[in-house]
């Protein structure tokens, strides 16, 4: 059987249409796993439909609220490739739905939900049979009836909500819960399960998702800073230190903290990778002296870099790609919603098996000459620099700020972002976040009167800090955010980037430049609408874009 998935930037693009629709997607996801993820999403939409109904009766089931976004997160690009676990999530969704339905019926014997997903049952235990059932829920199944524009808007909402669900899970792990957010999530997820076809309603929904995600990023920021302190500028070594070692990748700071606690006194050093790099800026994490540095570059290079790492690797969230290529599948471990067939999974927060494996391996035999980069420009630090930025602008020492961030990826056109960074004039500042920074974060950019020209604000969700800084600067200068000497040049890859974009658009931020390509699910008509409403456009050349942005 074949699949249909168009959710990430590397999706197949042909004159006949966009999307991975063969036996395997560009990410390595098989048609089986992709189709079963469609089935899981349908089950989650049915669960959300009953969660909405339950709230009408004052019933709030926290097991449902914690499970639903987490399971949805498992369908995000490069998270879970393990078909049996995807089916397990679908079964759990249905079991939770039936329990919630029973709670509703206990209050009102006539309780009903008008949603096509509300009574979904799995037809078999056989993966092949379930894959055939999943064909009913392929996202493009009614494309001929609704047209590409409606399908594109549905997917914009679905993928945006998926990105928000990921951030909800990150926040939930840190003890953050906001009933209004979960109520809104369930309402939108249930509505998408009705296969809506009204263009205006879908556009409004996309903006609602963006506004909701701003609140999600707020509680995630509160969770991270509340537990681990406010990030402050910190130098991080990106070269090896002699000793046994563990590499931890992803976004989950709690997993990193637990690993650091459990490796104290063991002689095992811990390295961050990918989006875990900003962890070094948090006081409660950098206090561990055996958190010795950051290893590697963008996630897309992991098959080479992980193969060379002389210790075990822990994946706490996206992005994982096929570990058998580099033959390190026997020493990579998955956590939480991450999965790869045949790879060992850690069900709880006990890392003793990983530590034991690290102690049996050689580790780095010698220390390399250190290469230090600076991270840790969190929200509090950025706000503390607001007056300095305004002073530099008023004295014409600082001409422009470029927010140059987002996802990294394998496409060659992404070298645009390296070229852009190196061509930013000396009187301009680069604010960066997310893993796109690996395109230029080891280069030297100097400073403007002591203020670094390259300012690393953190993970992708730390777009919240950048937004708060922009709002603060606008308030202090008595202008709108769009009137600031600030331009956003964003690289995208997956659904977290989509919801960040929706968040910015929902807040009224205009004239964003994105690349390296437009999302495959957005038609030329939809791109034209977004350009007309928000000034959103794709990158062209570094020279042309730089000239246009500096003259705006």
From Swiss-Prot:
- One Gene Ontology cellular component: cytoplasm
Q: Gene3D superfamilies of this UniProt entry?
A: 1.20.1270.20, 3.40.50.2030
Keywords, sorted A to Z: 2Fe-2S, Cytoplasm, Iron, Iron-sulfur, Metal-binding, Oxidoreductase
Q: How, per the record, is the cofactor bound?
A: Binds 1 [2Fe-2S] cluster. Binds 1 hybrid [4Fe-2O-2S] cluster.
Names of required cofactors: [2Fe-2S] cluster; hybrid [4Fe-2O-2S] cluster
Give the catalytic activity.
A + NH4(+) + H2O = hydroxylamine + AH2 + H(+)
In which residues is [2Fe-2S] cluster bound? 5, 8, 20, 27
**Which leading EC class covers this enzyme?**
oxidoreductase
* One protein family per Pfam: Prismane
Any single GO molecular-function term of the entry would be: peroxidase activity
Binding sites annotated in the UniProt record for hybrid [4Fe-2O-2S] cluster: 251, 275, 319, 407, 435, 460, 494, 496
According to the lineage, what is the superkingdom?
Answer: Bacteria
UniProt-listed GO biological process terms: response to hydrogen peroxide
Q: Which InterPro entries match?
A: HCP/CODH, Hydroxylam_reduct, Prismane-like_a/b-sand, Prismane-like_sf, Prismane_a-bundle
Where in or outside the cell it occurs: the entry states: Cytoplasm
What are its E.C. numbers?
1.7.99.1
Homology family: Belongs to the HCP family.
Q: What does this protein do?
A: Catalyzes the reduction of hydroxylamine to form NH(3) and H(2)O.
UniProt protein name: Hydroxylamine reductase
Q: Please give the organism.
A: Shigella dysenteriae serotype 1 (strain Sd197)
């Amino acid at each position: 059987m074949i699949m249909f998935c168009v959710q990430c930037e590397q999706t197949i693009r042909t004159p006949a249409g966009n999307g991975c629709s063969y036996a395997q997607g560009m990410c390595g996801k098989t048609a089986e796993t992709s189709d079963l993820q469609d089935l899981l999403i349908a089950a989650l939409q049915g669960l959300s439909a009953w969660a909405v109904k339950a709230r009408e009766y004052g019933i709030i089931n926290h097991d449902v609220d914690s499970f639903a976004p987490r399971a949805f997160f498992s369908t995000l690009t490069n998270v879970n490739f393990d078909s049996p676990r995807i089916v397990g999530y679908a079964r759990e969704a249905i079991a939770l739905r039936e329990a919630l339905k029973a709670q509703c019926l206990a209050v009102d014997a006539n309780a009903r939900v008008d949603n096509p997903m509300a009574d979904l049952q799995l037809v078999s235990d056989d993966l092949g049979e379930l894959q055939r059932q999943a064909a009913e829920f392929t996202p493009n199944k009614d494309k001929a009836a609704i047209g590409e524009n409606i399908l594109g808007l549905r997917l914009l909402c679905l993928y945006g909500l998926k990105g928000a669900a990921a951030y909800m899970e990150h926040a939930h792990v840190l003890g953050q819960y906001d009933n209004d957010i979960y109520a809104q999530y369930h309402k939108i997820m249930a509505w998408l399960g009705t296969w809506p076809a009204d263009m205006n309603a879908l556009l409004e929904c996309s903006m609602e998702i963006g506004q909701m995600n701003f609140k999600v990023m707020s509680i995630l920021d509160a969770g991270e800073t509340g537990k681990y302190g406010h990030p402050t500028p910190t130098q991080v070594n990106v070269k090896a230190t002699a000793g046994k070692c563990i590499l931890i990748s992803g976004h989950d700071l709690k997993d990193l903290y637990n690993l650091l606690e459990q490796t104290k006194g063991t002689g095992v050093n811990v390295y961050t990778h990918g989006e875990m790099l900003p962890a070094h800026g948090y006081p409660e994490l950098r206090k561990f002296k055996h958190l010795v540095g950051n290893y590697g570059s963008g996630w897309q290079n992991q098959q080479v870099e992980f193969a060379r790492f002389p210790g075990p690797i822990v994946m706490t969230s996206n992005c994982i790609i096929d570990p058998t290529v580099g033959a390190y599948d026997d020493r990579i471990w998955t956590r939480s919603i991450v999965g790869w067939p045949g790879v060992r999974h850690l069900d709880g927060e006990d890392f003793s098996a990983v530590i034991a494996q690290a102690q049996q391996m050689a580790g780095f035999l010698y220390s390399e000459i250190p290469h230090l980069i600076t991270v840790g420009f969190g929200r509090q630090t950025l706000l503390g620099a607001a007056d300095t930025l305004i002073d530099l602008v008023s004295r014409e020492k600082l001409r422009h700020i470029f927010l140059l961030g987002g996802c990294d990826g394998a496409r060659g056109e992404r070298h645009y972002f390296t070229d852009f960074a190196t061509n930013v004039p000396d009187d301009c500042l680069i604010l960066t976040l997310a893993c796109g920074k690996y395109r230029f974060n080891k280069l030297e950019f100097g400073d403007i009167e002591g203020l670094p020209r390259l300012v690393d604000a953190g993970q992708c969700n730390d777009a919240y800090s950048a937004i708060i800084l922009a709002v603060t600067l606008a308030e202090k200068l008595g202008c709108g955010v769009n009137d600031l000497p600030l331009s956003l040049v964003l690289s995208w890859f997956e659904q977290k980037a989509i919801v960040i974009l929706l968040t910015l658009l929902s807040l009224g931020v205009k004239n964003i430049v994105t690349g390296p390509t437009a999302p495959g699910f957005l038609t030329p008509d939809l791109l034209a609408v977004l350009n007309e409403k928000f000034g959103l456009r794709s990158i062209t050349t570094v020279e042309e874009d730089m000239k246009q942005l500096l003259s705006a």
